[in-house]
C-alpha cells in the first residue's frame, strides 16, 4: 500500500466516500498484496499487523483483492463500511453483560466523534426496560431538547410499537429516554443489525440520534435472553395452560 492509504487507514475516524469522491488501491501496490504463485490472495504480515493496530480486520482486504484482478480497485460506500475500512466517525460497538443477583443488565456503548451512544437493557420482575443515552454535551443536549417533540426506538427500521408519549429528559450531558419491551421485541432487538434511538425535531423533517447493530457483538452477551426469561414473568397468554381432568 502507498503512503496515502496508510495515512487514511491510520486515522481514528475514517469516512467512506460520498458523491463524486472515490478511494482506491493502485496497481503496483496490489501486486505486493497478492500471492502470485498460488493465485490466492493474502495480506503480508507487516500490513496485517498495521491493520490490526488500527482496529481494521485484514480479512476485509483479502475479500476486496479477491473480488477483482484489475490493476485498480475502487471501493464504494457499502464495501468500506462492511469491511470496517471506514467507520464514519464511530468506533467499534461494545457490549457488556455480567450475570449477577437481581435484574439482568446489558449495556451497548459506542464512542463517536461528538460524544457517546449508549443503550441499556434491564430485565426485572416488572418487565424489560430499554433506555437510550445520547451523549452530545450539555449545551448541545439542551438545544436539542428545546426542539424535541417526541422520542422513539426502531428495530430493523420499524418504529417499536405501541408508540410512547413520554418525552426525553436531560441527564448530565445526555438526552435520555426509556420504554418497556415485550420479550418478543427483546429477541428482535438482540438479533438485529439496525436498532435506532431517535428524538424528533419540532420541524418534523429532522431527527437526532443513532443506530447500533446488537447482533454484531452477540458473542459478548451469551445467555442474556435465557436469563431474562427466568426473571420476567410470563404473561397469561404465554404461560402454559393447566389442564384439569373432569370430575368423574
What residue spans do the PLM features occupy?
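Short secondary-structure transition/capping segments
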Residues: 10-16, 45, 69-74, 102-118
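Charged, glycine-interspersed solvent-exposed loop segments at helix/strand-loop junctions
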Residues: 24-98
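Functionally engaged cysteine thiol sites
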Residues: 1-7, 41-42, 122-128, 228
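Residue-level marker of positions within ordered structural domains that often coincide
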Residues: 12-13, 56, 85, 194
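Glycine-rich beta-to-alpha active-site loop
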Residues: 1-30
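Charged, low-complexity, helix-prone segments enriched in Lys/Glu/Asp/Gln
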Residues: 14, 44-48, 220-228
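A generic "folded-domain core" signal
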Residues: 89-248
Amino acid at each position: 500500500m502507498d503512503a496515502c492509504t496508510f495515512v487514511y487507514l491510520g486515522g481514528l475516524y475514517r469516512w467512506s466516500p460520498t458523491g463524486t469522491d472515490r478511494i482506491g488501491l493502485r496497481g503496483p501496490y496490489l501486486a505486493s498484496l497478492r500471492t502470485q504463485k498460488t493465485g490466492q490472495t493474502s495480506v503480508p504480515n507487516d500490513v496485517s499487523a498495521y491493520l490490526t493496530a488500527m482496529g481494521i480486520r485484514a480479512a476485509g482486504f483479502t475479500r476486496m483483492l479477491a473480488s477483482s484482478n484489475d490493476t485498480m480497485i475502487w471501493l464504494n460506500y457499502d464495501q468500506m463500511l462492511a469491511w470496517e475500512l471506514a467507520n464514519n466517525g464511530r468506533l467499534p460497538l461494545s457490549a457488556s453483560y455480567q450475570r449477577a443477583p437481581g435484574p439482568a443488565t446489558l449495556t451497548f456503548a459506542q464512542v463517536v466523534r461528538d460524544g457517546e451512544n449508549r443503550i441499556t437493557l434491564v430485565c426485572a420482575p416488572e418487565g424489560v426496560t430499554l433506555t437510550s443515552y445520547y451523549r452530545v454535551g450539555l449545551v448541545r443536549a439542551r438545544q436539542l431538547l428545546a426542539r424535541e417533540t417526541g422520542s422513539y426506538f426502531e428495530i430493523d427500521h420499524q418504529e417499536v410499537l405501541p408508540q410512547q408519549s413520554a418525552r426525553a429528559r436531560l441527564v448530565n450531558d445526555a438526552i435520555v429516554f426509556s420504554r418497556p419491551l415485550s420479550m418478543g421485541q427483546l429477541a428482535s432487538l438482540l438479533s438485529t443489525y439496525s436498532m435506532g434511538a431517535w428524538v424528533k425535531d419540532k420541524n418534523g423533517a429532522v431527527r437526532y440520534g443513532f443506530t447500533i447493530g446488537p447482533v454484531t457483538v452477540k458473542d459478548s452477551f451469551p445467555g442474556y435472553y435465557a436469563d431474562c426469561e427466568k426473571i420476567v414473568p410470563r404473561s397469561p397468554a404465554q404461560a402454559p395452560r393447566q389442564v384439569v381432568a373432569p370430575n368423574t
